[in-house]
């Protein structure tokens, strides 16, 4: 049974839940603020399909020979690029799959701002899949749905965190030529409960229900992305993402899932065909492509990935992978689990989660001093490059 995997190892990818033929596994085991798979012993038939599907217990993927190959990339569709978190690459890949008559599986917000994966061939759902969502996504039974349409001969593009890509691979148990796997560059994942708690705090602060949320609004530019929350009474919360209370917990690594600190799927071990994310450092390493509207890093890990990328309408330029790794170290290494995380969760046992968020994630004087120093350096750089003043 899947109980061979501890909560310290489990990525909550959902492969075991999808693999169980009698639906004996559900996300009912609570550890800290995450929900983990739990087996109903009264239903379990001990077939061990959950173990066979588990990416923690299974073989890890690796790039094809001659890969990975890296690119700086962006969409030429400027409205879609501005709507995206970085360079609009996911939109272009998903749009290509729709033009091929296929399906796309990716993460969306539902009407209560829970993050979940859906499988769809509708353009409006692709738009919902765009934008970063910094919370654990519930894949539900999407892996089963993906397998069903693959077996019918349909094409599918699956997008998710490396652990979710690995989970789908091991659930399927074989390669499908009609499946394109796209992993996101991943720092780690906070829980749905953490996000819902933060949303509740903000709704009380602004006195109305949340109607729209963007973690990476680019109204002030890609390099000045902000968390934007719109409420039913017309009020708006907009704050630089590096200052936002929720994102403070994320960036410090305090609110991440336990397995993220020893992730087994970094260094291209998920088995993805493509890896996508922000091309941080672009203003230094490739300034002629950086217009502050968003630029993506695309890393190709397979021949299938190359063929699909070549058919998409993505503007790209081959780029040194070492320069991507310099500013995206989470591609190779996990975040260190520091003492503050233990202190935070110990505090939640004495008080509630809201009080812990307020206490731990407000900007300190030292952090403010560091921020102002970084702003000074950025101001000097932008001035020398003639790019104008950064906003923060």
Per-range role (PLM):
Residues 100-103, 203, 208-392:
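Long, compositionally biased charged/polar accessory segments in the mid-to-C-terminal portions
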Residues 180-201:
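Short, flexible loop segments at boundaries between secondary-structure elements
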